Amino acid sequence: MMLKTAVRLSLLACCSAVLAAPATAQTPTPAPAPAPAQSAAAAKGTPPPPPPLLQIEREEVRPGKGAAHTANEAAWAAAYAKAQSPVQWLGMTTVSGPNEAWFLTRHESFAALEKSDASTDANPALSAERDRVAAVDGDLLTRSSTILARYRPGLSYQPAVNLPSMRYMTVNIMRVKAGHVEDFLEGWRMVVEAHKKATMDEHWAVYEVESGMPDTTFLFLYARKSLAEIDASGPMHVAAGYRDAMGESGRRNMNEASRSGIEMTQTMHFRLRPGMSNLGKEWAETDAFWAPPAAVPVKTAQKK
């Protein structure tokens, strides 16, 4: 029970930077584009801060349709590449639980999001291909939804990470009870300060949902190079350094705030999927993991 509690605390106390995009809706061409998933400078060692606005396309895939869905997502990327659209997104699929695919894209504001959508609609060829691929998606999914969430820097800790080097993303969904939001915010600011004091080797970004999920829902996002990081996360939060930084009263107050103020939590682990993403060439230049798969040569029958 103690280990389970420690692991859960670690999941509630860490998460990391985001970027990327949706497999539907979003799409600019001539008008102001959303900020790129990660700039070349960022990929080379200066990670950008999390975007002010995050858009998430959440898709639930029908049983047995995973391979077909993966192939159709590649068609999305091909359509945007052909149209030379600046829209970029990061695709990822669940490691456990229901078969879901999430597509994340960054925006500077709601105005930028609106211009992005308008510019895609103004491109007839891209719009037509988008509608065609979306129709195929409809036969592969049981449900899809769009989530818009705003970045909360005061609740985040060392959020800028070198995303091209990451392979997994954990999302912890927390819904706060009405009337308890201020206590929740105060508690998490205390967690951030304790992490700073203990110089914890963690990174997370927090987003508050604006639409697409119930109000007072917060998303804690953290990127991982390996799932093995989860093994170290639990013990790290019960070690003396962090316990001293939180203090006995801090731990007691945080536990009480969680019991009385949190309506629900859900933790989801995702694997990042290059083939379902549409990212800048700097990603592949930084890490070959993101390079498009080489075309398989077609063998022709030899003449007899």
Feature map (PLM): residue ranges:
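Bacterial N-terminal signal peptides that target proteins for export
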Residues: 1-13
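C-terminal segment of classical bacterial N-terminal signal peptides
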Residues: 14-25
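Short S/T/G/P-rich N-terminal loop/turn motif that feeds into the first structured element of a domain
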Residues: 25-304
